[in-house]
Amino acid sequence: MSDRILSLFKPFEAFLPEVISPERKVPYNQKLIWTGVSLLIFLVLGQIPLYGIVSAETSDPLYWLRAMLASNRGTLMELGVSPIITSSMIFQFLQGTQLLQVSLDSKEDRELYQIAQKVCAIILTFGQALVVVMTGNYGSPSDLGIAISLLLIFQLMFASFIVLLLDELLTKGYGLGSGISLFTATNIAENIFWKAFAPTTVNSGRGKEFEGAVIAFFHLLAVRKDKKRALVEAFYRENLPNMFQVIATVFVFLFVLYLQGFRYELPVKSTKVRGQMAIYPIKLFYTSNTPIMLQSALSSNIFLISQILFQKYPSNPVIRLFGVWGIRPGTNGPQVPLSGISYYLQPIGSLKMALLDPIKTVIYTAFVLGTCALFSKTWIEISGTSAKDVAKQFKEQGMVINGKRETSVYKELKKIIPTAAAFGGATIGALSVGSDLLGALGSGASILLATTTIYGYYEVAAKEGGFTKNLVNGFSEMM
């Protein structure tokens, strides 16, 4: 059955653009150049406004997830990496439920699997672009006209396809790491930096204030006579970034770096060389930032579908159960879910909000921890890091677990790796919720994603660039 499903994508192989894998290893300096060029192209796409927009003043159901999805509203990067991540999530689900079985040992299966994911991402891009345009995000479709509506859809599809190819370029060995992680982490870092150091001023009702928390801190200390009151305002001002959020963000960043050094060291020995011993490390974050990326993609699709359905059928009881959307009382911000399933899946925002609605806090925490653990446990089967895959690597390299027989390697690894993956995913989820409670700049998930991606790039650079200084181990020792 699964073979027939994959074979359906065989005809697309002939005309679907593809990045050819390099015939030999790409030098480190060239990888840096390709990575920089890819990032530059992504940043440019995120600054080019869509041509043909009549109005972009409608509600934005994804405003708190845009940093996570590398999305900039009203630009070519409106959809960000959402279609690509969603496509990956769909195929992960199909594999995890055994509806689709792929032999990673088969070159043909791997190629068809990649083509299938790419086709799915293109279809999702078209669907999301169609929904965004036809629901009036850029003006009423009747005001836009058919030609402009089609042009907007084409622009969104073109930009998303460029991002898809850039990600493929990096993951196939021309650059460093994953394009999706790189683009998302860059967008998050840019967002955090802006909230901390933005020199723009806004009228908050207390007079003009600097938007950036650090700039506002020094400005308030300089102009206010009452320094104590100035400090309190700089650290706890509402509706604008404050210094407490900056400190919370730095704390979360350092704490995640500290946790990167946590690992279970599995003693192994060689069956080929007598007396040769080694350590096989199983990290706490065994699947890195993948669980939180997939969890964010799932949430974004739920919120998008919920708001679209509510706009069309606001009085339907089933739709209202899915989510009731409106502007939060006492604010003039974007529309948010006020009740329904979407409300309970929305990030908490702060410790105060968590205490005011403990039921939502419990449900949201359980949702994040559960989905992250599930995604992490499923991902190891797809990424080639499952107990079966590691046992195969051990056999090929002539390694066994110290004190265990060669025939029991898989059984021992099966006790450790799935548990480590699930626990690591749940830990990522717990850190995300904790960051939200602290009120860190951006969302907890975005800070975790940026930190793990930055550390991942550090590891890749250390490995390929020839320097071996272990920043995190040194940091862990200091702690």
UniProtKB/Swiss-Prot annotation:
Belongs to the SecY/SEC61-alpha family. GO terms for biological process: misfolded protein transport; post-translational protein targeting to membrane, translocation; retrograde protein transport, ER to cytosol; SRP-dependent cotranslational protein targeting to membrane, translocation. The keyword Transmembrane applies. InterPro entries: SecY/SEC61-alpha, SecY_CS, SecY_dom_sf, Translocon_Sec61/SecY_plug_dom. It is found in: Endoplasmic reticulum membrane. Coiled coil: none annotated. Heterotrimeric complex composed of SEC61-alpha, SEC61-beta and SEC61-gamma. Residues 54-75, 140-145, 267-361, 435-440 are lumenal. One of its GO terms (cellular component) is fungal-type vacuole. Residues 1-32, 97-118, 167-245, 383-415, 459-479 are cytoplasmic. This is Protein transport protein SEC61 subunit alpha. It holds the Pfam family Plug_translocon. Appears to play a crucial role in the insertion of secretory and membrane polypeptides into the ER. It is required for assembly of membrane and secretory proteins and is essential for cell growth. It interacts with other membrane proteins required for protein translocation. Upon binding to SEC62/63 complex, secretory precursor polypeptides may engage SEC61 to begin membrane penetration event. A cycle of assembly and disassembly of SEC62/63 from SEC61 may govern the activity of the translocase. Keywords: Endoplasmic reticulum, Membrane, Protein transport, Translocation, Transmembrane, Transmembrane helix, Transport. The keyword Transmembrane applies. It comes from Candida glabrata (strain ATCC 2001 / BCRC 20586 / JCM 3761 / NBRC 0622 / NRRL Y-65 / CBS 138) (Yeast). It is a multi-pass membrane protein. The chain crosses the membrane at residues 33-53, 76-96, 119-139, 146-166, 246-266, 362-382, 416-434, 441-458. Its main location: endoplasmic reticulum. GO terms for molecular function: peptide transmembrane transporter activity; protein-transporting ATPase activity; signal sequence binding. The lineage of its organism: Eukaryota, Fungi, Dikarya, Ascomycota, Saccharomycotina. Signal peptide: none annotated.
